[in-house]
Amino acid sequence: DSRNIQSLTNNIIWNIFSDQEHNIWLGTDYGISLSRYNSALQFVPISQITGTGDGNQFYSLFRDSKGMYWFGGTNGLLRFIHPTGNRHEAVWYRMGDKAHPLSHNRIRHIYEDKERQLWIATDGSINRYDYTTQEFVHYNIIDSTGTYNTNWAYYIFEDDSGNLWIATCLGGIFVVDKHKLMQSKVGQYVAEYNYSIHNGLSGMFINQIMPDKEGNVWVLLYLSLIHI
């Protein structure tokens, strides 16, 4: 309700996360809603952060260990230092941008691994952020047969052995040695393992994967939930 300052910017909520100050962030079709700790919701227009009139529908919101905010959606990835202050230092990573290119504009998941490396899952495979160059490194990953790949990557996490698990749509689940992947040259990287309908999965549309304390990996598929 536009008459109520405590209402949401839009009823379609794609992502919610809590930052270190206990503020609640909501990514919506019309921008960002911020619920400050013990305060009312605050509407933050994207233009206030970027200084442009371009929009984005946010699917994944994240604040990394260095204090940077990362908001990804249907129109690329925003990086900025503070959404409501006077200094934003916003950078917009998008396909075709000469200064800040990205493999795909659709961002599904933003993840920081155990060594504080930042990864994103996109509809153009996965990318790792290089804090030195401030650019993203793109990785193409395939299974050992060349049948499946990590295009349409939906989710990422790192296990206790240093392997990245990558959930995809139509490609199954990929398990890769993170350090070998980072040391690989440009081109296709063959995953250490791939889960598909041929070896345990009930489907190939994987929305999310999550490890538990017992070492199981829970897999959220379209209309079903399994663990491996």
Residue ranges of model-derived segments:
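Carboxylate-rich, polar loop motifs that coordinate divalent cations or form catalytic acidic clusters
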Residues: D1-I228
